Amino acid sequence: MQHGTQRRSSPGEAKTMAAIHSGKYGKLLVSKGYCCKSRWSIGTKPIETPPDYLNFDIWNGPAQKLDFHRTLVHYNWHWFWEAGNGDIGNQGVHEMDVARWAIKDATLPTKVWSMGGRFLPEGKDQGETPNQQLTVMEFGETLLVFETRGLTGNKSFPDWPTQVTNEFYMEGGVIKG
């Protein structure tokens, strides 16, 4: 069984990683991942009693007890600190995993910095976690750069084949995913 990092099962991804790891294009300098999906406001809903069909105590698990509101359950949980960590941990983990996979023999980064926030054209909503975030990790001589942009999508980047992708910058060229 595989959970959460299914892109490692793709023959195309494995072929790309083999080419990068072989040194065919020189040393990997920067491994980038993007998650640029439109993630608009989740709105604001009042606190209420959970519906009868939902055992909210089980749903909440060991996290600090949350108040039930319809912006939390079922999909938008990742916009709240007690339940998630934003789009970097929702969609982002898939592209970040591929970016890290490209860094041969990577273990843990030696340095990390990250900045972001929750920015909405509609103003504030109930969400807490970032919908815009830039993270840079150092793995020796290779940087892993990961970016989530929740206010943009394909229309803003017509040359990108998907809203989520990876790019690999090497001494001898670039592979765009």
Where do the model's predicted regions map?
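A generic secondary-structure signal
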Residues: A19-S22, W101
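Rossmann-fold NAD(P)-binding glycine/threonine-rich loop
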Residues: M1-H3, K15-A18
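Beta-strand-loop-alpha-helix segment that lines the small-molecule cofactor/substrate pocket
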Residues: M1-S9, G23
